[in-house]
C-alpha cells in the first residue's frame, strides 16, 4: 500500500496524528520510507512512544498480530503510529511510505507453534483462520458488520 501524508496547511490540533496507534493484522509488514522523513513511532516496553530512527533508505520490519499468535506472545505485534512532523523544524513536510503486508492464505490455521509452548504451558490464543482473524480485525476497527456477514464473507472466500 502506498501512503501519502500531505503537508500541513494549518496548525495541528492537540493530539492530532497522521495515523493513530495500531498493530498490523497479518504476520509481517515491510515498510519503506523516504530518507529523513519519518514520523513513525513504536510503543516501547516502558509504554513510551519512541521515534523509529531514520538513517539511509532502509526497510523496516514490523511483526503483526498473526506472528504474535504463532509464537504464543514471545514475539510481540508492534504497536505503532505516525506522528506529525515537528512544526518548529519543517511544518510543510509531506510524508510518503510504501508498505507490504504479508497475510497468510485465507484458510491458513493460525495456532501456536509447538516450539513456542513450554512444558505445562498452554496456548494464549485460540486457533483461528487467517481470514477470520482479518475479518474480525476489520469488524472491530473499520467495518460495521455482524457475525453472520463475517461467516458469509468466509464462505465466499473458501469457494474462490
Label for each model-derived stretch:
Residues 1-160:
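C-terminal flanking tails of non-heme Fe-dependent oxygenases
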Amino acid at each position: 500500500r502506498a501512503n501519502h501524508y500531505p503537508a500541513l496547511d494549518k496548525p495541528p490540533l492537540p493530539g492530532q496524528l497522521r495515523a493513530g496507534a495500531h498493530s498490523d493484522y497479518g504476520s509481517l509488514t515491510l515498510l519503506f520510507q523516504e530518507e529523513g522523513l519519518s514520523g513513525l513511532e513504536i510503543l516501547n516496553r516502558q509504554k513510551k512512544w519512541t521515534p523509529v530512527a531514520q538513517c539511509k533508505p532502509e526497510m523496516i520490519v514490523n511483526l503483526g498480530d498473526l506472528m504474535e499468535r504463532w509464537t504464543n506472545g514471545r514475539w510481540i505485534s508492534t504497536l505503532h503510529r505516525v506522528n506529525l512532523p515537528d512544526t518548529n523544524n519543517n511544518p510543510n513536510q509531506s510524508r510518503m511510505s510504501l508498505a507490504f503486508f504479508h497475510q497468510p492464505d485465507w484458510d491458513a490455521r493460525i495456532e501456536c507453534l509447538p516450539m513456542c509452548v513450554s512444558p505445562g504451558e498452554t496456548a494464549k490464543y485460540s486457533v483461528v483462520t487467517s481470514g477470520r482473524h482479518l475479518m474480525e480485525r476489520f469488524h472491530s476497527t473499520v467495518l460495521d458488520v455482524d457475525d453472520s456477514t463475517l461467516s458469509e464473507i468466509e464462505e465466499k472466500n473458501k469457494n474462490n
